[in-house]
């Protein structure tokens, strides 16, 4: 099962466009046009839900095409937008897909994965809601094993208090738990047949459902370990699986966001080379058309409509142009947003301003060793200078260049911090120059190191 980042739901769908942009500004520097476009798209979802009658179903999202080099914030804008609204979010590269009928991933797997994320999100929220009851039931099962089902209420209460206080954490008990060993051999994937691909199915689950029972096995475990196994088991019993699946499908259909990166790589150009490659790229585009326009995809949880899922496509378009995409696909991505290349000022802001800026992250990491890092303004400026220089001379990877530069800059400190006697280190422009100047001036070396 895929893990998803889950938080308690907040009603952020009603945020105004300006409020959405302000939220995005907390984490992302610049790119105001892109922020404005996604803010309007999100607000329109809220507006659509307030429209009454049949007209609501006719209002479809205006999908977005983001144009910009790598590292300028395309993915981060979409990801933060989804996190802001607790929407199911799925990112995939267009180059991962092959045309239906060829070996490889088909585009419908996008929706299957999106629904899987939505199910995991809803399930995690449901488990939070039943956590207290699940813990109570788990403790009762442990007490049954510890003192027996027929023990007096006084005895059970006495041992319950010890379990809750952690006094018996290292006591070994014998307890019956669910047997998660696959029956008949693990999972398999239905072959790629157009319209019939349902995703990964677990053969053991299918047999278990058919027999109408679940296997258990008796294990010897410490009480503290048993709690981590039994609480999830009891949570599963308390939550309504059918209700979760229905809520997840509804969430994916109405609030889902799909981010398709590198869409320029499947655009056909006159310089594309092999004819077979052109046909394959065009085939993937044609497969994407019904998905973006609105269709029904069969998943293991049931049919999912894609009519109201927001699709955000992006690409650098250094070689291909947006007009090289199929005209039909261009029409399904009506909102075009061009993201700006990052300047030196942008790099400085990225280092300092976001709530989770890189400088704050590295300072916090080294701070756990009780070593305080202090960056001077001149050091920040020098780091930004080097990032721009390497991007221009080697390859432009945008803000991602800052990660490689800071890793090299702080490599020795990171290695020695746990044994340092000095508790404060000032990073100034001279320190930056001493650490990085040899690499920056040797561009052949910079290609490999930075």
UniProtKB/Swiss-Prot annotation:
Database matches in CDD domains: RecA-like_HslU
Recorded GO CC terms: HslUV protease complex
Record Gene3D superfamilies: 1.10.8.60, P-loop containing nucleotide triphosphate hydrolases
Gene Ontology biological process terms, A to Z: protein unfolding; proteolysis involved in protein catabolic process
InterPro entries referenced in this protein's UniProt entry, alphabetically: AAA+_ATPase, ATP-dep_Clp_protease_ClpX, ATPase_AAA_core, Clp_ATPase_C, HslU, MCM_dom, P-loop_NTPase
Sorted UniProt keywords: ATP-binding, Chaperone, Cytoplasm, Nucleotide-binding
SUPFAM superfamilies, sorted: P-loop containing nucleoside triphosphate hydrolases
Signal peptide: none
Binding of ATP, residues: 29, 71-76, 261, 328, 400
Pfam families with a match to the protein in the record: AAA_2, MCM
Disulfide-linked positions: none
The keyword ATP-binding appears for this protein: yes
Top-level taxon of origin: Bacteria
GO MF, one example: ATP binding
Protein location: Cytoplasm
UniProt keyword annotation of Nucleotide-binding present: yes
HAMAP family: HslU
Assembly notes: A double ring-shaped homohexamer of HslV is capped on each side by a ring-shaped HslU homohexamer. The assembly of the HslU/HslV complex is dependent on binding of ATP.
Protein family membership: Belongs to the ClpX chaperone family. HslU subfamily.
Role, per record: ATPase subunit of a proteasome-like degradation complex; this subunit has chaperone activity. The binding of ATP and its subsequent hydrolysis by HslU are essential for unfolding of protein substrates subsequently hydrolyzed by HslV. HslU recognizes the N-terminal part of its protein substrates and unfolds these before they are guided to HslV for hydrolysis.
Protein name: ATP-dependent protease ATPase subunit HslU
Name of encoding gene: hslU
């Amino acid at each position: 099962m895929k893990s998803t980042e889950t938080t308690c739901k907040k009603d952020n769908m009603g945020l105004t466009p300006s409020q959405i942009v302000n939220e995005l500004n907390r984490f992302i520097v610049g790119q105001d046009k892109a922020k404005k476009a996604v803010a309007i798209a999100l607000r329109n979802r809220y507006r659509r839900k307030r429209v009454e009658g049949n007209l609501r179903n006719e209002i479809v999202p205006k999908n977005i095409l983001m144009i910009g080099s790598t590292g300028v914030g395309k993915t981060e804008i979409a990801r933060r937008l989804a996190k802001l609204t607790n929407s199911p979010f799925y990112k995939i590269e267009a180059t991962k897909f092959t045309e239906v009928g060829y070996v490889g991933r088909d585009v419908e797997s996008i929706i299957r994965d999106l629904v899987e994320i939505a199910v995991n999100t809803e399930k995690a929220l449901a488990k939070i809601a039943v956590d207290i009851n699940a813990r109570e039931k788990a403790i009762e099962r442990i007490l049954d094993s510890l003192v027996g089902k027929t023990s007096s209420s006084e005895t059970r209460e006495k041992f319950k208090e010890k379990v809750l206080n952690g006094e018996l954490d290292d006591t070994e008990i014998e307890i019956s738990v669910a047997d998660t060993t696959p029956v008949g051999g693990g999972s398999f994937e239905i072959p790629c047949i157009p319209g019939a691909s349902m995703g990964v199915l677990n053969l053991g689950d299918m047999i278990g459902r058919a027999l109408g029972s679940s296997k258990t096995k008796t294990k010897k475990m410490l009480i503290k370990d048993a709690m981590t196994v039994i609480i999830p088991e009891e949570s599963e019993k308390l939550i309504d699986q059918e209700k979760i699946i229905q809520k997840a499908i509804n969430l994916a259909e109405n609030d889902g966001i799909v981010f398709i990166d590198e869409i320029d790589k499947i655009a056909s150009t006159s310089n594309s080379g092999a004819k077979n490659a052109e046909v394959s790229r065009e085939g993937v585009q044609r497969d994407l058309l019904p998905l973006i326009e609105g269709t029904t995809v069969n998943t293991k949880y049931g049919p999912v409509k894609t009519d109201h899922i927001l699709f955000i496509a992006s690409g650098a378009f250094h070689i291909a142009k947006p007009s090289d995409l199929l005209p039909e696909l261009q029409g399904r991505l009506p909102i075009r947003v061009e993201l700006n290349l990052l300047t030196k000022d942008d790099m400085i802001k990225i280092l300092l301003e976001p709530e989770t800026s890189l400088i704050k992250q590295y300072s916090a990491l080294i701070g756990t060793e009780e070593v305080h890092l202090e960056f001077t303004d001149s050091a920040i400026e020098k780091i930004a200078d080097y990032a721009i220089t390497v991007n221009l001379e080697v390859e432009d990877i945008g803000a991602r260049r800052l990660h490689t530069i800071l890793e090299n800059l702080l490599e020795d400190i990171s290695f020695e911090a746990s044994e340092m006697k000095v508790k404060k280190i000032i990073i100034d422009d001279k320190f930056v120059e001493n650490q990085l100047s040899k690499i920056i001036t040797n561009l052949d070396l910079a290609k490999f190191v930075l």
